[in-house]
Each structure stands twice: as C-alpha cells, then as structure tokens.
C-alpha cells in the first residue's frame, strides 16, 4: 500500500540493478516483455521501476467492481498502461509501440493455455501466451524481479533486471516453458516467502497424479 498512498517511503530505501538491459532494448526500438512473478511487492516494485523507465502491467479485472476500480485507479499512478490479460491485440500493439510490459507466467491456467513443464521438480501447467506475444510483436523477453530485504523495521527494496532471454521464443513450446519456469525458480529462491503461494500453482495435475488442493 505504500506504493499507492505513501511512495516517499521508498526514497533512499531502494536500488535497481541491470537497468542497462532495458536501456539497450529501448535503444534498439524493441518492445519488452518483463518476465516477473506475482510477488507481494508487485506495486512497490512497479513504483521503483517507474522512477527509471515507463512500465506497463498486465492485469486481470477483479470480480468485485468496487475493488477493481480502487486497484485500477491506484495503479494508474504507477504504470503507463494497464492491459487486460485477455486483450492480446492490445498487448501486441503496446509491445510494437515499444512498451515495457510486466507479465507474470507463473500461474496455472490449465492446458488449454499452456503445457506441462516442471516447476521446482513438480509437473505444472505453464502458460505459453508469452511466446505468441513475442513472436508477433518482435519484442524481447527480459526477466525482472523485486524483493524486500534487511531489517523488517527498516527494510530495503531491490529491483533486479536480468539480460534478455536469448532465442525466445524457440521452435519448442515445452522447452520454452521449462526455461521460463527455471527463470521464475531462480527469482523465487532469492525471497521465497514473498511469492503468492496461495495461487494454487499445481492445480492442474497430469493423468494418474493425485490432486493437491
């Protein structure tokens, strides 16, 4: 909530590493798909990023219209654009225009929208929509992660931007899903308690496997 109502909280408390990867992609006129996770610090990380470049965000409208309006209005102070995750044309258009869109391929939307790939060694339905977005828009994929560290009474915040993912998308959607899951695994190992584990990542189970939830 600090990112919405008290952004000055982050002054002198944050750092950003790897900004040159964003700068380089923008200098080449490329759109950027920022591969991130559903972190509890989503809007804090977005606010910090907005001090250095203009981020956009993919979102799913809330079921409660009042809550949806509140979140949308608050995030409008952080992100350049908020694009519905079902609006593929809007996402492609923004990427073609050179936007940098935060996108999180870390949820289970079933096998109609993905493939099975190991996630921390457990088979998990992994979305593949990012492959289509990248292929159509000619954008690049850049992993981005943000986390909190230090004393809980005086925390620090860091944004970590990694180099562009080479050859993404490839010709193999399963291999691409495995690569994306490995990127997310590496991010979560930095601060595992700050990921939204309640999102039922293993909801879809392969045939013959017992349900977890």
Set out the residue ranges of the language-model regions.
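Residues in well-ordered beta-strands of folded domains
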Residues: 17, 58, 160-162
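Catalytic core of membrane glycerolipid acyltransferases/transacylases, capturing the structured
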Residues: 28-86, 97, 111-114, 152
């Amino acid at each position: 909530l600090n990112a919405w109502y008290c952004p000055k909280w982050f002054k002198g408390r944050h750092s950003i590493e790897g900004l040159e990867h964003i700068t380089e992609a923008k200098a080449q006129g490329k759109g950027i798909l920022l591969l991130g996770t559903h972190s509890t610090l989503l809007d804090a990380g977005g606010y910090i990023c907005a001090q250095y470049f203009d981020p956009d965000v993919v979102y799913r409208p809330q079921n409660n219209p009042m809550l949806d309006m509140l979140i949308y209005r608050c995030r409008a102070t952080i992100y350049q654009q908020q694009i519905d995750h079902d609006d593929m044309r809007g996402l492609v258009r923004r990427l073609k225009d050179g936007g940098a869109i935060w996108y999180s391929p870390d949820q289970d939307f079933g096998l109609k929208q993905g493939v099975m790939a190991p996630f921390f060694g457990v088979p998990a339905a992994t979305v593949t929509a990012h492959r289509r977005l990248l292929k159509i828009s000619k954008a690049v994929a850049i992993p981005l992660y943000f986390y909190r560290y230090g004393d809980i009474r005086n925390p620090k915040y860091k944004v970590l931007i990694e180099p562009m993912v080479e050859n993404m998308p490839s010709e193999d959607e399963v291999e691409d899903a495995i690569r994306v899951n490995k990127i997310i695994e590496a991010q979560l190992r930095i601060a595992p308690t700050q990921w939204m584990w309640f999102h039922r990542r293993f909801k879809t189970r392969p045939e013959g496997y017992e349900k977890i939830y």
